[in-house]
Each structure stands twice: as structure tokens, then as C-alpha cells.
Amino acid sequence: MRHLALEMISELLDLGLDTIDGWLHTEFRPVPAGVSHNMSLHEMYDLDVTGQEDENEEAVDGVFSDAMLLAAEEGIEMPNLYSPGPLVGGGEMPELQPEEEDLFCYEDGFPPSDSEEGEHSQVETERKMAEAAAAGAAAAARREQDDFRLDCPSVPGHGCSSCDYHRKTSGCPEILCSLCYLRANSMFIYSPVSDSEPDEPDSTTADSNHGSPPTLRCTPPRDLPRPVPVKASPGKRPAVNSLHDLIEEVEQTVPLDLSLKRSRSN
């Protein structure tokens, strides 16, 4: 029995070797030239298995992308390319609607250089100045539309259009305008405007329609003391009891000696 088993194993091994040898020598798997059946590991490592170049390789690569070729090798099903069907309603093209597309690039680029930062800061300053000018013009236009008017009522803070304007804009019902505040706190004396004086006849020209400056009618008294310029004396100024003592003329009886030094008063 043991002898029969060894013979069967030997026959199976021979059959397997013949099958492998026949498969290697078929036309689909030709043996490369210069390759013997008994090849060493070094010879198998240097074996050139590239084969001949395919003339249609570039054309195929140009038609099909790498993803499609890889999917074909891996057996992955690729979705069919969209192909428009026949036009509906005849050969006329459908009416297309315009669409706005955002073509702005939101990616962060390289940091700006020093010159670009200077230009950017200048542009930013000009933009802020333009915005401030526009805001000021808009505020002035709003003020003109609100029609602010200065008012002076008989009772400060009551029935005043200026106070009503400030109360409406600020939202505070107890606020007063500047004029009513000064009048209410007696900071200044306000009185009604007096009537204009009648025009006096002009004494310099024959035209009586134009007024002349008022005439001085009050004559000063004869004994009115007048200030007299007095030179500074080297001595100490004497004490006085009233202002009249300073403006009285002092009689100079002794001549001044200019050769002497001025005495210092302690």
C-alpha cells in the first residue's frame, strides 16, 4: 500500500510539472528570449519584462484619464458621462437666464511687502476720510431737514421750539436749550429790545436822513483834578491817604543830582 501511494504522488507531481511547463510555452505567455528553464535568483532579478512599446499608448492616455484607466484595471464601474438628449420642441435653443457668479478669491496670499503696506494704509486713510466726509454731509442734511430754529419764549423751557428739538433728538423730556438754561439760572440779564432812537439831524452834511454821532453836552467842572506825569524819585515813595494825594503836583525846590547813585530802600 505504501508503494502504491508513493507512485501516485510521483505521477501527480509529474502531471503538475508538465502542466506548468505547457502553460509557460503557450503563445499567450511566451518565454522571454535568453531565458533558460533553470534560472537563478540573480537572473530573475535582472529580467526585463517590459516587453515591446505599445504604439497606441499615448493615444489611449490622451482620450482616457488616469482615473478611468485605474478604474478599469480595478474593475470599478464609472458613472456614464452626461450627454444631452435631443432638443424638445424643435431645433430652437432654450432661453437662458443670466446668473451672477462670485469670482472673488477668498484665499489668503503671501503677506504684503513694506511698499504694499504703505499703499494699503494710504488707501485705507483716504477711504476713512471719504466715509467721514460723507457722514458729515449726511448729518448736515439731516439737520437741515429737521429745521432747527432758535426760539426765545417768555417762560424759559415752556413752548420753546429749540427745547422741543433737543428733547426729541436726545429723548430726555427735561432737557433745556442753552438760551433757556441761561435765562432760567439767571446767568445773564435778558430784557426786551428797546425801540430805536429817532434819527438826529446830521451836522456835517446837508443830508438829514443819516444820523450823526451823539453830541457831548456835559461840560466837566473847572476844578477837576487831572493826572500829571511825575518822574520816579530815587527816594522811597511816601505814604498816601487817598488817590488825590498821588495826582497832586509836587513842587520841586531842590534840583536833582544825577551823579549820585540811586539809594536802595530796605
From Swiss-Prot:
A motif (PXLXP motif, interaction with host ZMYND11) lies at residues 94-98. This is Early E1A protein. It comes from Simian adenovirus serotype 7. Its main location: host cell. Coiled coil: none annotated. Interacts with host UBE2I; this interaction interferes with polySUMOylation. Interacts with host RB1; this interaction induces the aberrant dissociation of RB1-E2F1 complex thereby disrupting the activity of RB1 and activating E2F1-regulated genes. Interacts with host ATF7; the interaction enhances ATF7-mediated viral transactivation activity which requires the zinc binding domains of both proteins. GO terms for molecular function: zinc ion binding. Residues 193-244 are annotated as: Disordered. Signal peptide: none annotated. Keywords: Activator, Early protein, G1/S host cell cycle checkpoint dysregulation by virus, Host nucleus, Host-virus interaction, Inhibition of host innate immune response by virus, Inhibition of host interferon signaling pathway by virus, Inhibition of host STAT1 by virus, Interferon antiviral system evasion, Metal-binding, Modulation of host cell cycle by virus, Transcription, Transcription regulation, Viral immunoevasion, Zinc, Zinc-finger. The keyword Ligase does not apply. InterPro entries: Aden_E1A (IPR014410). One of its GO terms (biological process) is regulation of DNA-templated transcription. A motif (PXDLS motif, CTBP-binding) lies at residues 255-259. A motif (LXCXE motif, interaction with host RB1) lies at residues 103-107. It is found in: Host nucleus. The keyword Transcription regulation applies. The lineage of its organism: Viruses, Varidnaviria, Bamfordvirae, Preplasmiviricota, Tectiliviricetes. Residues 39-47 are annotated as: Interaction with RB1 in competition with E2F1. GO terms for cellular component: host cell nucleus.
